[in-house]
Amino acid sequence: MTTDPTIFDESLGKELHQPLSVARMLFSGGMTVLAFLLTAAAVVPLFAILFEILRQGFPALMKLQEVRLFGVPVPLPEVLVSLPAPEGVQDRANGFANAIVGTLMMVGVACLFSVPFGVMTGIFLAEIGKNSAIANVIRFFTVILSSVPSIVVGVFAYGVIVLTKITIPIPLLNFKIQTGGFSALAGGFALGVIMLPIIALSTEEALKLVPTHHRLASAALGGGRFQTIFRIVVTSAIPGITTGVLLAVSRAAGETAPLIFTALSSQFWPQGLFTPTPSLSVLIYGYASSPFKNQNQLAWTASVVLIGLVVLSSILSRQVTRKRLKRR
């Protein structure tokens, strides 16, 4: 016994073209309005913060100063090429170029420490250990570390690096690593501890998103376990891993509390990895509460630059991901 399919087509068509009841239309409209209001509640504060920071800090970027680059005079914002002026001094160039350099130095040190260990930890959790007891323990402590307040990390780095005097010679490079005292090395270590769990967990999630048939295809072609992991799985997950690393960099660049305990600050150019080093976040913290207007203004402008660096890293991560996906 067969059923005429046109009967179902006609009934389905009538159901689809039947007008909605007033109650359903009101409910649908109400939920749409509610969704819009909730979205606005999340977005409006963000735009309000950005607007106020740009309004207060952007005008100072319009004040230019000529700097010679490779013998050619180039006009650049004064705040990006000058050192901070002394307190209360109004008639000289006022900037935070040293804080930008110090921030990049410490984030670079943090990346040297956290990226290799974080990526390898993520690979172990996703591909090697998986659900083993060791992997579960590592995953548990990694999640806990990601939720530890940054000021606690700063106190830890203060005790381990700042208060401990150790000299580690590196004969091949004719170089010595020295701990003890406030330094960019201590600040980079603290930021690296903050970045480590973010990179590890994001790497694990990125590797889990790689389809299983990629692994099976590699095994079918004779690929070994580690060949499959590093040449197939990790390569496919590079966009996600890169995004996680850049998100961790964004988080580290905005940290203040750990750097107060480790790198402290300075009014001068960074003198190396083993001396007190300025940073944008600490400069903002100190100058925002200053009684001098020129330092208050510098705090607003430094906030604009710091947000710009974070936004730039986010855009960079998206571009890297898109290019990688297009190649595939």
Language-model features: locations:
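C-terminal transmembrane helix and the adjacent membrane-cytosol boundary/short C-terminal tail
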Residues: E204-K208, T212-R215, A219, L246, ...
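Periplasmic/extracellular loop-to-transmembrane helix junction in inner-membrane transport proteins
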Residues: K14-V33, F51-A110, N131, I177, ...
